[in-house]
Amino acid sequence: MIPKIIHYCWFGRGEKSKTIKKCLRSWEKKCKDFKTIEWNEDNFNIESHPFVKAAYEDKNWAFVSDYVRLYALNLYGGIYMDTDVQLVKPIDGFLENEAFLGFENKNNVANGLIFGIEKGHWFTQKLLADYDSILYVANDVNFRMKNTNTERATKILVDMGLKLNNQFQIINGIAVYPSEYFCPLDVNTFLMHKTKNTVSIHWYEGAWTSARYKEWKRQQIRRNRIDKVRCLPQRMLRKFLGDSTVDRLKSKIK
């Protein structure tokens, strides 16, 4: 059984944003009897692994976190979440799994959305061992894209039989949930697909991302809001008149 410990990483000693503080408060509210551990420069030895040391010197906090989350989960077990993950429901029901995580989309799983696992599990040990043969490369976009935890975790599970179909599966004891559970916000469109099964929302705050990406994200969200307002009259008509009536009226207008 997965222990009631929540791990998160905060390296670089920067100020936490309002979104991140809101997400952390949601953990306290939904997981009142969980222990929470913040991993940072004070309780993790940056010099303990060459990959972490190089990533830290490059101020690539995301890659530092990629390693440290696995270290923490392997040592203690528990739950890891990125700091921009908001809980909307309790997670106690998932603790009966020996390990669980979720699809980010139909193409990959992600262990930053929420990743629960028993201590000393083969999956964290395998992911950790990979870092012994990875040389960190600074300022290389191709390296960053190919060496995230998401990419490597997905590859391991696919090699063991995971089907990239965004459907619930259990692979060698690891429960993989559809994106509606832990990732209802589409990272490409920033459209929300929340359902009755949604447990958490990853807001893609991306503290390590570029200003260009953040501006693109703001513009995308703005366009989505404009489209939502523009389509409001038609949605209201469909709600009160029904789809068939609205479609019939539209065909007559044409």
Model-based region annotation:
Residues 67-78:
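Small-residue hinge/turn detector
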